[in-house]
């Protein structure tokens, strides 16, 4: 059964996971009955039938023209995000909602100052965060070059979707600096 995307930080808290393999056209879903390792096993089983070239062909079909290398990187990131918390215990849904509210407020205050400060001269060599910064710039440009409050929040939500987990404070700062530098090059 097709549904809208459900892509939570803790996938095991959902009764059904819908996996969106980086594409507008290819959907894979699996029903989850219990929490914990059963969900991880179900997702692994689901992913074993999906190849990264589906991501590549879907991106090309969507007119985005990803190279095979970019598709492989994105695919690896999807796998990493899905399984990086495998050994951690699940939190109750109530504490997850509470945590998400706090993270949203932190994100808001962090990204409100996106264009107010000058970045330092050095950019850390973190390819994952750099990719997030590039995608953020693309997202901001889609809505116009002078982002208002809502556009900045949309950009951060876009980052969270790709990253799969909320950014740490130091990661937000690194991405903010990269975004500023990338926008200045335009």
UniProtKB/Swiss-Prot annotation:
Description of how the protein assembles with itself and partners: Oligomer. Interacts with host HNRNPK.
The record's similarity note reads:
Belongs to the asfivirus phosphoprotein p30 family.
Cellular compartments annotated: Host cytoplasm; Host nucleus; Virion
Q: Is Phosphoprotein one of the keywords? A: yes
The organism encoding this protein is African swine fever virus (isolate Warthog/Namibia/Wart80/1980) (ASFV)
- Top-rank lineage group of the source organism: Viruses
What does it do?
Answer: Modifies the subcellular distribution of heterogeneous nuclear ribonucleoprotein K (HNRNPK) and may contribute to modulate HNRNPK functions related to processing and export of mRNAs during ASFV infection. Necessary for virus internalization.
* Signals that turn on the gene: Expressed in the early phase of the viral replicative cycle.
Query: Which keywords does the record carry?
Result: Early protein, Host cytoplasm, Host nucleus, Host-virus interaction, Phosphoprotein, Virion
| One of the record's GO cellular component terms | host cell cytoplasm
Question: Does this UniProt record's set of keywords contain Phosphoprotein?
Answer: yes
Name of the protein described by the UniProt record: Phosphoprotein p30
